[in-house]
């Protein structure tokens, strides 16, 4: 997700013992490059990103986590798994714009 949306910001703090989770929609993706091939290393996130209501949430989109998150083999070889906590901390302009467009035109979720 972060590869295709440059305005998304990752946490990048020192990871703790908490294991990152992925939702049904994001299941099987590499957290860094969105690749579906060769999952290799388990994702660790910082304690702040796994605290309170954020516990067990998807690392990429914030949905309900159903499976463990993994880095792909290529990101592990390039040592991108050592850059810090990979949790996305902001919404990004696409989701923010969608929210305000819905509000502006009065669309409601079913």
Swiss-Prot record:
The Gene Ontology biological process annotation of the record reads:
mRNA splicing, via spliceosome
Lineage, broadest ranks: Eukaryota, Viridiplantae, Streptophyta, Embryophyta, Tracheophyta
Q: What is this protein called?
A: PHD finger-like domain-containing protein 5A
Question: What family is this?
Answer: Belongs to the PHF5 family.
What Pfam families is this protein classified in?
PHF5
Q: Which domain of life is it from?
A: Eukaryota
């Amino acid at each position: 997700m972060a590869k295709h949306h440059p305005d998304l910001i990752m946490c990048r703090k020192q990871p703790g013992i908490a294991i990152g989770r992925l939702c049904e929609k994001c299941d099987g993706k590499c957290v860094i490059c969105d690749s579906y091939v060769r999952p290799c290393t388990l994702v660790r996130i910082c304690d702040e990103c796994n605290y309170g209501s954020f516990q067990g949430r998807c690392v990429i989109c914030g949905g309900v986590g159903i499976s463990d998150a993994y880095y792909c083999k290529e990101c592990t070889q390039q040592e991108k798994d050592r850059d810090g906590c990979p949790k996305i901390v902001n919404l990004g302009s696409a989701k923010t714009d969608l929210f305000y467009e819905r509000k502006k035109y009065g669309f409601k979720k079913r």
